[in-house]
């Protein structure tokens, strides 16, 4: 629901507004620099929470990128007390990508089943603690662009067809 701008060669793009999926992958492949993201606008979240309260919602669960890779989760915590009409929870997902999407689907499913807010948060916490992800780095040049790997190591790794597998867990 909140836009996360992608910065490509110092120009901001937002998926679905001024960038589609095909353009994204093309720009990523052709970029000299690693693509960066900026945090969603905190004012947008504040406005969204106000709109939800005005529409009669009473409970809100927000799932954002892991606090380990984005400062948005920590910043979002300041808004919780500003919306006294809402019971708001922004748990740290400690993950991103597909596992976070699964969390969103599960929260929606549990809500549609009529599960209480507290039980949803408890089940979500269990899911967060038990979620791990493996990411295959198909192109070592992305690690070079991000400063995680030297050019020499990338050349050698590419010659040997090395594809690192990164493991993410709740820690």
Regions found by a protein language model. Name each.
Residues 18-41:
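Phosphate/nucleotide-donor binding subsite
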């Amino acid at each position: 629901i909140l836009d996360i701008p992608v910065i490509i060669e110092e120009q901001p793009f937002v998926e679905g507004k001024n960038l589609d999926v095909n353009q994204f992958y093309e720009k990523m492949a052709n970029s000299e620099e690693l693509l960066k993201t900026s945090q969603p606008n905190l004012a947008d979240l504040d406005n969204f929470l106000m709109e939800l309260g005005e529409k009669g919602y009473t409970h809100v669960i927000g799932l954002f990128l892991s606090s380990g890779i984005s400062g948005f989760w920590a910043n979002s915590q300041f808004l919780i007390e500003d919306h006294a009409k809402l019971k708001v929870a922004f748990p740290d997902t400690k993950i991103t990508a597909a596992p976070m999407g699964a969390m969103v689907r599960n929260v929606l499913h549990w809500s549609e089943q009529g599960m209480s807010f507290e039980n949803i948060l408890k089940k979500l916490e269990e899911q967060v603690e038990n979620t791990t992800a493996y990411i295959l780095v198909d192109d070592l040049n992305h690690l070079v662009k991000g400063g995680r790997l030297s050019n020499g190591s990338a050349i050698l790794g590419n010659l040997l067809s090395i594809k690192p597998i990164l493991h993410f867990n709740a820690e």
